[in-house]
Regions:
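Short coil-to-beta transition motif at edge beta-strands of beta-rich domains
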Residues: 1-17
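Intrinsic disorder/low-complexity segments enriched in polar/small residues
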Residues: 4, 10, 31, 48-51
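A generic structural signal for ordered secondary structure
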Residues: 7-12, 23-25, 39-42
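Short beta-strand-centered aromatic/proline hotspots
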Residues: 18-30
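Short aromatic-glycine-enriched beta-strand elements
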Residues: 33-36
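Intrinsically disordered, low-complexity, charged/polar segments
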Residues: 40-68
Length: 68
């Protein structure tokens, strides 16, 4: 499990559903974890989104909607 502050690189985490929505799925392995997801595009526009996993039944899996 990565320690707080460590950079975690996820390869090809994007999932598309039947409706054509794009989602970002990350497995972190435990609950009560806050993730900061860094989005950067080719124009060097950076966006940071925070999401907290605090459901012990979630098995440490988070899915975020990706706005296109």
């Amino acid at each position: 499990m990565p320690k707080p502050g460590n950079l975690v690189e996820v390869t090809n985490p994007f999932i598309s559903d039947d409706l054509g929505n794009t989602w970002l799925g990350v497995v972190v392995g435990e609950s009560n974890v806050t993730l900061t997801v860094h989005f950067a595009d080719d124009n060097a526009i950076h966006e940071y989104r925070k999401a907290t996993i605090n459901n012990p039944d979630s098995n440490g899996y988070i899915i975020m909607n990706v706005v296109s």
